[in-house]
């Protein structure tokens, strides 16, 4: 009798387990179906049906809105929920170095706003001995890109040999030092009117001074490793050069030598090599 009761009890438990398992499976299937249905409804709401109304792109001077729309795949029929905007942003910035940043704002479910920030060129790049405009420019971060729109009046860095720093790359070493030199002249030492920096020489940068087209050979401690510390050395050298240049100690000087530390040149600032037209500061 007891044995029958035990068997009956065990059989009841098994039935409950089976029933519970079936109910769990049914619930999981139901949830999956419901999730997929809800997902389909959501995806349907994210489709671009009117790109002009649903997509807003603020472009720049060089990179146009249609290019950005193409790179991101923003067109009628595209689904905003299926676009990996972070990945598209990275790909676009890699392919178009003119772009400094891209801001993306989603307005769920079916709108998106994109703002493009372009790089601002501060110098042109060329090759020593070549007159042809390469179209290469660099911004204050040293990133090289192509731009010919309104860049003719920018100062130029002459690299030693072709092809020079390619677009999409960043200036380094002596080229970056020349960029910092020209920017510092523009911001703090305008009396020099520096318009060109030739980095083909191993020991110094040759700078053309725009007021009279005289030449200045400039070097400073740590010039090939630009940093806040070495920037101070550059500023000291330019300050010393500016004082000598504006004092017009000798109008026959066509080449200024600013390669020595100021401490070594104070006693020699009036010394001029007449035959070679080289002046020590």
Where are these regions (language model features)?
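Charged, solvent-exposed interaction patches on well-folded alpha/beta domains
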Residues: 1-55, 66, 70-91, 100-281
């Amino acid at each position: 009798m007891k044995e029958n009761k035990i068997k009956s009890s065990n059989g009841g438990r098994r039935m409950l387990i089976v029933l519970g398992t079936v109910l769990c499976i049914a619930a999981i299937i139901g949830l999956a179906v419901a999730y997929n249905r809800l997902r389909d409804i959501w995806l349907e709401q994210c489709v671009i049906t009117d790109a002009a109304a649903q997509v807003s792109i603020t472009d720049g001077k060089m990179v146009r809105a249609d290019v950005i729309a193409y790179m991101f795949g923003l067109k009628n029929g595209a689904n905003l929920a299926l676009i990996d905007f972070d990945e598209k942003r990275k790909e676009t910035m890699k392919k178009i170095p003119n772009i400094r940043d891209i801001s993306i704002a989603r307005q769920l479910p079916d709108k998106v706003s994109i703002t493009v920030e372009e790089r601002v060129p501060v110098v042109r790049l060329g090759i020593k001995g070549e007159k042809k405009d390469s179209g290469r420019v660099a911004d204050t971060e040293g990133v090289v890109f192509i731009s010919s729109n309104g860049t003719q009046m920018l100062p130029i860095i002459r690299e030693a040999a072709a092809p020079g720093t390619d677009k999409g790359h960043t200036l380094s070493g002596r080229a970056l030092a020349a960029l910092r030199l020209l920017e510092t002249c523009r911001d703090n030492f305008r009396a020099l009117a520096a318009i060109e920096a030739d980095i083909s020489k191993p020991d110094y940068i040759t700078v053309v001074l725009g007021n009279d087209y005289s030449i200045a050979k400039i070097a400073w401690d740590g010039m090939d490793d630009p940093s806040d510390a070495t920037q101070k050395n550059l500023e000291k050298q330019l300050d010393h050069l500016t004082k000598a240049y504006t004092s017009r100690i000798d109008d026959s000087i066509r080449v200024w030598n600013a390669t020595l530390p100021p401490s070594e040149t104070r006693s020699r600032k009036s010394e001029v090599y007449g035959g070679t037209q080289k002046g020590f500061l």
